[in-house]
């Protein structure tokens, strides 16, 4: 059955990819940009148009003719954002029988796959094919963006079509996750090598939507690529430790360096780019993004000053001004939770992809594993300080001395939904603690710092089991998903 499934998937993928690369090319590259074919022949307009579409397609909010925002809701917000323990929604989608209770909806699960392959990988393929020889820098940046886009897809599903995307051979098969990750490392290595031949500001910086404003340089792209390589190396630390150590060493020793300064936040900009944050639309306009119970438990327990940056106080009678979350799988009388804490994200909030804080925590884990000469505790504390700087919540010294742990979760309306705290590590670094306790501290703080990027948080929680999350209250998977182990991957869409 497995062989038959893969054969059918591969055959249908070829049809999808061929159609995507040809039939709608004009729609993707003209209608949404305002550039005419004649204008595209000048300067970097052709590549710039493709590049902008790809950047909009990472934290997906690209309008291919069927509206915006709702794609992101099913691609990420009702999946990774919820499974990561970050967010929840009080509305009973599909009569309450949706992903929140592990009754996985094919129409939701497939949008990440379908939209990425149908609209984003096509642009990457065009950029690679046309820039490889003529514009190596464009080619290199396309490679970096390709990895940033596609590692998220592999983290969702496992095997993906990557190395042979767009080929017409009917025998094309998906890459295993291991092969895909090895290809990610090759692409990042090639991109870094190509960009090392350049210096100064990008010649196409006006199309750059994700590097920090005033720092849109080739060097910044190399630091992002290096940091991305370190992220992926740490991701496979348990599955393929030798390869992980090798790739981490390349990142940690490369002269271009890593993202580490406060300004080096990689995010899709909403400032005059035509991009709006889809999570902000779902949150502010639709009223469908609320604090998850795990965020309440951990941030309130730690007395974490970032809590007010991430969520608004509740407005319900009797608990107005407090921070209240919703536990995943909460019973379907959801309207009672409509006055709980909502996200602070707006349509104008830049969509964060990677921060210096995350990179410091990656360095902390690398040091903990003996991959570098750095001190794990020093890197850990620098990660916390970097996140405090990013959110402008003051100095972190008091927090880093704190022995506070997560608080018990008390449901506002239903006592049986309440739960004892599961995360029992404190912010204070303890050099005498066990290696596993140190890892739990690193990942828990990285989870806090990565907010609101649910894809990365969910991937790391599945890899390590940290932070320890409350299990789903109601499990409607018919035994397919273990309540304690929790969901590990999304199903492939039936369409493939």
Regions found by a protein language model. Give the residues of each.
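Extracellular glycan-recognition regions
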Residues: 24-26, 110-112, 466-467
């Amino acid at each position: 059955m497995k062989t038959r499934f893969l054969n059918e998937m591969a055959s249908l993928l070829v049809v999808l990819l061929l159609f995507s690369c040809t039939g709608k090319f004009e729609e993707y590259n003209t209608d949404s940009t305002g550039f005419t074919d004649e204008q595209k022949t000048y300067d970097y307009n052709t590549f710039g148009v493709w590049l902008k579409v790809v950047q909009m397609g990472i934290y997906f909010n690209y309008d291919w003719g069927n509206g915006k925002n709702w794609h992101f809701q099913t691609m990420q917000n009702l999946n990774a954002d919820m499974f990561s323990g970050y967010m929840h929604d009080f509305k009973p989608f599909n009569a309450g029988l949706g992903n929140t209770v592990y009754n996985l909806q094919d129409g939701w699960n497939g949008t990440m796959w379908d939209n990425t392959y149908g609209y984003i990988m096509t642009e990457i393929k065009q950029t690679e094919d046309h820039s490889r020889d003529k514009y190596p820098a464009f080619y290199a940046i396309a490679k970096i963006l390709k990895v940033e886009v596609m590692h998220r897809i592999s983290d969702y599903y496992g095997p993906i079509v990557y190395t042979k995307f767009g080929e017409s051979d009917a025998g094309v098969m998906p890459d295993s996750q291991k092969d895909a990750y090895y290809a990610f490392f090759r692409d990042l290595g090639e991109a870094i090598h190509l960009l090392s031949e350049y210096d100064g500001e990008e010649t196409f910086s006006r199309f750059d939507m994700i590097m920090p404003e005033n720092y849109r340089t080739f060097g910044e792209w190399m630091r992002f690529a290096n940091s991305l390589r370190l992220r992926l190396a740490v991701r496979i630390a348990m599955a393929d430790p030798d390869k992980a150590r090798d790739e981490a060493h390349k990142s940690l020793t490369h002269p271009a360096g890593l993202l580490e300064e406060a300004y080096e936040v990689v995010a899709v900009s909403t400032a005059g780019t035509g991009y709006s944050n889809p999570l902000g639309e779902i949150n502010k306009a639709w009223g469908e993004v609320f604090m998850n119970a795990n965020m309440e438990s951990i941030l309130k327990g730690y007395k974490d000053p970032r809590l007010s940056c991430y969520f608004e106080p509740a407005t319900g009678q009797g608990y107005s001004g407090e921070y209240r979350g919703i536990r995943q799988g909460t019973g379907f009388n959801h309207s009672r939770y409509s006055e709980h804490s909502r996200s602070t994200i707006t349509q104008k909030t830049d969509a964060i992809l990677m921060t210096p804080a995350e990179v410091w925590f990656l360095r902390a884990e690398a040091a903990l594993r003996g991959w570098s000469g750095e001190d794990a505790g020093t890197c850990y504390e620098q990660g916390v300080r970097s996140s405090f700087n990013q959110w402008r919540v003051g100095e972190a010294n008091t927090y880093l001395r704190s022995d506070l742990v997560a608080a018990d979760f008390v449901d506002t309306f239903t006592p049986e939904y309440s739960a004892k705290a599961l995360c029992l590590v404190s912010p204070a670094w303890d050099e005498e603690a066990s290696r596993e306790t140190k890892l739990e501290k690193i990942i828990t703080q990285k989870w806090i710092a990565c907010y609101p990027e649910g894809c990365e948080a969910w991937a790391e929680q599945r890899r390590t089991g940290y932070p320890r999350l409350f299990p789903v209250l109601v499990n409607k998977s018919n035994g397919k998903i273990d309540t304690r182990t929790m969901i590990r991957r999304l199903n492939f869409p039936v369409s493939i």
